[in-house]
A protein has these predicted regions:
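Patatin-like phospholipase
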Residues: 1-38, 46-292
Length: 292
């Protein structure tokens, strides 16, 4: 039996690749001790934390109706005024209601909906990264929810994950109110898209930390350049910021504990990818874990 902590990078729909890597490691008897993730990586980490296995997570990710999550192709057909109104009034184009309810149902199937259900002595083995853009700070959930007058153990896992996946401008942010003030919580990728550091200690660790990261492998440069409206441009800028944030800070010691998986040129918000592409991402993840 192998023991390790697992950290998953954000990456939107590309995170399907992680399920392939997980399945390969499970064949070796991997037992996850602590888990952490940002954005879509937070979804994967949360599913593992409540007891799902790799094959189950793959099915859940494939069954998710991504058209209800955010149809970027359809939004391009909307009048600019309609898209702009969503940004002005709600601070985002798409609602996170569907994805939050979907996650809640999946966690409920395992009987573990709150952090207290997966914690021991008030210590959660799951850490979710989010960003408070109002107060300009990184959040590690559930711990940092105390800053908003809430009990970390009573926090819904689905709510924490929803905070982490709320890509600025694309999704409406989660609003937290405390002492008469309101804070907007968005995608953790703004502050740390690959929190490989989160379980590091000064002394020798009890077990290793393995990171799961997505790389483009240059495929994005082969994409057809098309005319973009202003809203699509904003989404692209945010995606670029999130995808590249931690890249320049990845140290050599982090690279050797990271399974880097090609993303096949798939974009973070490309929710309409085919089942065939999802299978290719899964295969890439499986093969890269096999080489690790």
């Amino acid at each position: 039996m192998l023991k390790a902590d697992g950290v998953f990078q954000g990456g939107g729909v590309k995170a399907t690749a992680f399920t392939g890597a997980i399945c390969r490691l499970e064949k070796e008897g991997m037992m996850w001790q602590r888990l952490a993730g940002t954005s879509a990586g937070a979804i994967i980490a949360a599913f593992l934390a409540v007891g799902y296995r790799g094959k189950e997570i793959k099915k859940i990710m494939c069954d998710l109706d991504y058209e209800k999550v955010g149809n970027i192709t359809a939004i391009k057909k909307f009048p600019l005024a309609k898209k702009s109104l969503g940004l002005i009034l709600e601070k985002g184009i798409f609602s996170t209601v569907y994805i939050e309810k979907y996650l809640e149902e999946m966690f409920k199937n395992k009987g573990k909906t709150k952090f207290k259900h997966i914690s021991l002595n008030g210590q959660s083995p799951l850490k979710i990264i989010a960003s408070d853009v109002t107060n300009k700070r990184l959040l590690i959930l559930p711990d940092d929810i105390k800053k908003y007058g809430m009990d970390p153990m009573e926090l819904e896992i689905s709510k924490a994950v929803t905070m982490s996946i709320s890509i600025p401008f694309f999704f409406t942010p989660v609003k937290l109110k405390y002492m008469g003030k309101e804070a907007y919580i968005v995608d953790g990728g703004i502050t740390s898209n690959y929190p490989i550091w989160i379980f590091d200690v000064k002394d020798v660790p009890r077990w290793p930390t393995f990171g799961f990261k997505l790389g483009n492998g240059g495929d994005d440069f082969n994409r057809t350049i098309e005319n973009k409206d202003f809203i699509s441009y904003i989404v692209d800028v945010v995606e670029t910021t999130i995808d590249s944030y931690d890249e320049s800070y990845l140290r050599d010691k982090d690279k050797i504990r990271t399974i880097s998986i090609p993303a096949l040129g798939v974009k973070t918000t490309e929710f309409n990818i085919s089942l065939e592409t999802k299978e290719k991402l899964y295969k890439e993840g499986y093969e890269k874990a096999d080489e690790f």
